[in-house]
Amino acid sequence: MAFELPNLPYGFDALEPHIDQQTMEIHHGKHHNTYVTKLNAAVEGTDLESKSIEEIVANLDSVPENIQTAVRNNGGGHLNHSLFWELLTPNSEEKGTVVDKIKEQWGSLDAFKEEFADKAAARFGSGWAWLVVNNGNLEIVTTPNQDNPITEGKTPILGLDVWEHAYYLKYQNKRPDYISAFWNVVNWEKVDELYNAAK
């Protein structure tokens, strides 16, 4: 069965003024859609068509070598963006077990946000910043391009796209401003759900 572009759980303008409508329309309808189209082309006629995107990306080493790069880039792009849309909400509220765990590990939510922001800003070129569960503990990691932490056995529960296509229309070269705005639209309820499933 072909992979499909998921619908957004909110309107394209729902995250204004933090993430603008035009960026959301292009990011979802063009960028993410292209990953889905290219992923489907890469896996057509292989047994990967019957697997979940999580299973494929977690086991990239088992993907045939001739399509491995295409699947890594486009499968990762599809998985990362599908999760990213769910991690955003116009009704952000900082609460849940995961917020308590963050405070326990970092001392405060602000200290966590600062480290996350620093690592996201320092990610050279295109990539992602993540909060992951690794052996029961929380870790902040970054990945290049469309790589996902599940390839390394870590479970992502919060992710931020720091490719320029995610912010350039509104923030231009000011990635730190985009990262700062991100905290206003984090879906902590979803982060908490993922944390409780992974711990």
From Swiss-Prot:
Pfam families attached to this UniProt entry: Sod_Fe_C, Sod_Fe_N
EC code(s) of this entry: 1.15.1.1
Cofactor or coenzyme needed: Mn(2+); Fe(3+)
Gene3D superfamilies (alphabetical): Fe,Mn superoxide dismutase (SOD) domain (1.10.287.990), Iron/manganese superoxide dismutase, C-terminal domain (3.55.40.20)
Cellular component aspect of the GO annotation: cytoplasm
Residues that coordinate or bind Mn(2+): H27, H81, D161, H165
Cofactor note: Binds 1 Mn(2+) or Fe(3+) ion per subunit.
Effect of T23P: In strain: NEM2021
Any one GO MF annotation of this record: metal ion binding
Alphabetical list of InterPro entries matching this protein: Mn/Fe_SOD (IPR001189), Mn/Fe_SOD_BS (IPR019833), Mn/Fe_SOD_C (IPR019832), Mn/Fe_SOD_N (IPR019831), Mn/Fe_SOD_N_sf (IPR036324), SOD_C_sf (IPR036314)
EC class (word): oxidoreductase
Catalytic reaction equation(s): 2 superoxide + 2 H(+) = H2O2 + O2
Induction conditions: Transcription increases slightly by internally generated superoxide stress.
Binding site for Fe(3+): H27, H81, D161, H165
Recorded consequence of changing A111T: In strain: 1K07
Keywords recorded for this protein, A-Z: Iron, Manganese, Metal-binding, Oxidoreductase, Stress response
Additional remarks: The levels of SOD activity and sodA expression were growth-phase dependent, occurring most during stationary phase. Expression is not affected by manganese. Is not essential for aerobic growth in complex medium.
Function: Destroys superoxide anion radicals which are normally produced within the cells and which are toxic to biological systems. Catalyzes the dismutation of superoxide anion radicals into O2 and H2O2 by successive reduction and oxidation of the transition metal ion at the active site. Also contributes to the inhibition of lipid oxidation. Manganese-preferring enzyme, less active with iron than with manganese.
Subunit structure: Homodimer.
UniProt similarity note: Belongs to the iron/manganese superoxide dismutase family.
Name listed for the protein in its UniProt record: Superoxide dismutase [Mn/Fe]
Protein species of origin: Staphylococcus xylosus
